[in-house]
Amino acid sequence: MILNTEQSMVQEMMRNYAQNQLKPTAAHRDKTHEFPAQELKDLGALGAMGMTVPDEWGGAGMDYVSLVLAIEEIAAGDGAISTIVSVQNSLICGITLAYGSEQQKQTYLPKFASGEWLGCFCLTEPHVGSDASAILCKAERDGDHWVLNGVKQFITSGKNAQVALVFAVTDKQAGKKGISCFLVPTNTQGYLVTRIEDKMGQHASDTATITFEDCRIPLENLVGQEGEGYKIALSNLAAGRIGIAAQSVGMARAAFDAAVQYANERKAFGVELVQHQAVGFRLADMATQIEAAHQLVLHAATLKDAGLPCLKEASMAKLFASTMAERVCSDAIQIHGGYGYVSDFPVERIYRDVRVSQIYEGASDIQRLVIAREVAQV
């Protein structure tokens, strides 16, 4: 795919910022678990926190191809930050734009798009991951308020977000059609951060357990219509999966670049590693896999921009890119030898960061199920 002028400018701008500002400090954030508050403000100023939000709502008004290019470049600098940016764009801004009332758009979108307010997506629960229809968190009417009770788990930015998009059961008898979506300011009484996960990677991105204890919000905080929550959640997961695929490509590319640099500097048997055919062949395979995944991502994003169905293509991109990224990062470690296993070199961190891409926003086997159902249709 040949990028247009605007897309190329976005790619170059984000690459410059990520390589100069995010990459040099990524290891520090990984070790200290420091939340990237300033970096997110910077990205907001660059338009990266609401890229597809129209100008009238304070966004950059760009296409989805530009968004995935930005996510890929950010991920090449710091995978943890790219997760926050992907969720903010694909899920938080995407849902508010598509389903929010005019008042909700006026109140929330400009602050989401600028990065002033960070959002978190509260769908997963302790016993519910892939089967979103089985959530237990409930919301009950009480006068002019909804009262939320329940627990959400593995919530990206759950501690640091200003607003949560929460999915809860409003009609237990209605099954999938009894789930609704709500905007919940995180400073609301009854919104409790009860656990911060100690994760394998992506340490700069907090992942929290959120407990709702008689959390009262106004009736007007309902997003869309009552009972639309399941549809809302699933309608934007395809977009989210393209974003995760893009970040997988970015992290794989970072590991590949580190491997190329190391292979050109390190000598074995009197010559640089890159001169050994085994290493050269490994690099060739890595480069081919990265490019294939990159093109899958762009294809899915192009379909989305055209308003065409992209469920299958989004799942293909996420499945292939996330699997590819782990393999490429593993190969990058192998090229580094023992140095690849220690934190002095970035490939150890990138490998830990990339592993979750096969789990969140739909595990790999869920993507296979989606693809199988789509290709089996006659």
Which residues are covered by each model-predicted region?
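Short Ser/Thr-interspersed hydrophobic loop/turn segments at strand-loop and sheet-helix junctions
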Residues: 47, 71-75, 168, 184-189, ...
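Short Gly/Pro-enriched turn/cap motifs at secondary-structure boundaries
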Residues: 112, 127-130, 154-157, 171-173, ...
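Flexible, small-/acidic-enriched active-site or ligand-binding loops
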Residues: 134, 189-218
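A short, charged helix-loop
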Residues: 210-232
